[in-house]
């Protein structure tokens, strides 16, 4: 067929059931490359390379594409507004439609370009983690297959709490150890607990008892928990595919930070036998033992909510930095003004609580976050007016990035939940084979 020489004066484009009539002259210089290519087609074979089907009698070209997306694209190329995403349509799907018709990402409005970049970045990260979790090195020979399969099952049992019944039991036991260790840590700081422990030992053995934390009931429980965490960490390191990647993971670094202080404190008590040396090391020992609080972060391995929180903070670091800048700027302004109004003017009602700007910063941050301890407050009329403005400003500033953080949290939650469900299905099918 030859366009522009005889025949019908117009052609019909049928895109997903929606029909559009175009003149031949308009078709020749049409902004969409795929549509304009129809003008140069000389045979039906050339036409079918451009569209999905062709009706010679009605001179109609069929495209099995998204009709609503093409409608938005057609409005854009005709000069009616700017190109934005179609409602209720995935950004990546709309972008694929743009590529099909011959447009690029640069044709999108800036806000839509940012949405597309964020979605492509998230999808790339998601698929990279997916491929990393799916890839399995092939065994060298038939004899290596059973051991490789066993190591893979062990790795997934320790890494994926929802992969099997054994993984769920192991995760439950680990959670119990974390909870027990946290309860013992909190109880060991109670005055009644320490008094009861001191009454059960003799005065002569008190120094040796203090130097050996394993002799206390709480020390015994701590040693058992540390033993479990250490064994779990070692096994997970042995069965991991990539040892370097294992060491770099944030949760594994937290495990190391939670376990190492115990062994350091044990070594310090062994090498500081004299009481004077022990007293000098007492503060260090208490700090190291208090680092057991990091164990609570181990729960992130077993609870999707904590994983969602960490992933949200990672993706929203720009919004968090913006929030921090807002707070710092407002705190600098309000602290300087409050110090001037309450103390710097040397009035008879000088407020000593606002003697310096750093002291006023405490009042500003407490007021902006609407906590209001009441330990210090303005007493002058201008200071109270400034306090009201400070509170309202804090509410507004804190609310600005909340929308971005909320949407990111919901997106991260659905991604992690979908990934967990997919692992459960794939692993169940694999273990049944």
From Swiss-Prot:
Q: Intramembrane features: residues?
A: 358-369, 370-377
Q: Please tell me whether the keyword Ion transport is annotated for this protein.
A: yes
SMART domains recorded for this chain? Answer: BTB
Membrane-spanning residues: 166-187, 218-239, 251-271, 282-302, 318-339, 385-413
Give a Pfam family name.
Answer: BTB_2
* GO cellular component annotations of the record: endoplasmic reticulum; plasma membrane; voltage-gated potassium channel complex
Please list the residue ranges that the record places on the Extracellular side of the membrane: 188-217, 272-281, 340-357, 378-384
GO biological process entries: protein homooligomerization; regulation of potassium ion transmembrane transport; regulation of potassium ion transport
The coiled-coil regions, if any, are none
Specify the superkingdom.
Eukaryota
| InterPro entries with a match to the protein in the record | BTB/POZ_dom, Ion_trans_dom, K_chnl_volt-dep_Kv, K_chnl_volt-dep_Kv5/Kv9, SKP1/BTB/POZ_sf, T1-type_BTB, VG_K_chnl, Volt_channel_dom_sf
Q: Which residues lie on this side of the membrane: Cytoplasmic?
A: 1-165, 240-250, 303-317, 414-433
Membrane topology category: Multi-pass membrane protein
Give the location in the cell. Answer: Cell membrane; Cytoplasm
Q: Where is this motif: Selectivity filter?
A: 370-375
* Keywords, sorted A to Z: Cell membrane, Cytoplasm, Ion channel, Ion transport, Membrane, Potassium, Potassium channel, Potassium transport, Transmembrane, Transmembrane helix, Transport, Voltage-gated channel
Q: What coarse category fits the chief subcellular location reported for this protein? A: membrane
The protein's role, per its UniProt record = Regulatory subunit of the voltage-gated potassium (Kv) channel which, when coassembled with KCNB1, modulates the kinetics parameters of the heterotetrameric channel namely the inactivation and deactivation rate. Potassium channel subunit that does not form functional channels by itself. Reduces the deactivation rate. Moderately acceleratee activation.
What is recorded about the domains? Answer: The transmembrane segment S4 functions as a voltage-sensor and is characterized by a series of positively charged amino acids at every third position. Channel opening and closing is effected by a conformation change that affects the position and orientation of the voltage-sensor paddle formed by S3 and S4 within the membrane. A transmembrane electric field that is positive inside would push the positively charged S4 segment outwards, thereby opening the pore, while a field that is negative inside would pull the S4 segment inwards and close the pore.
What does the subunit comment say? Heterotetramer with KCNB1. Does not form homomultimers.
UniProt lists the family membership as follows: Belongs to the potassium channel family. G (TC 1.A.1.2) subfamily. Kv6.3/KCNG3 sub-subfamily.
Name of the featured protein: Voltage-gated potassium channel regulatory subunit KCNG3
Classification lineage: Eukaryota, Metazoa, Chordata, Craniata, Vertebrata
Name of the gene encoding the protein in the UniProt record: Kcng3
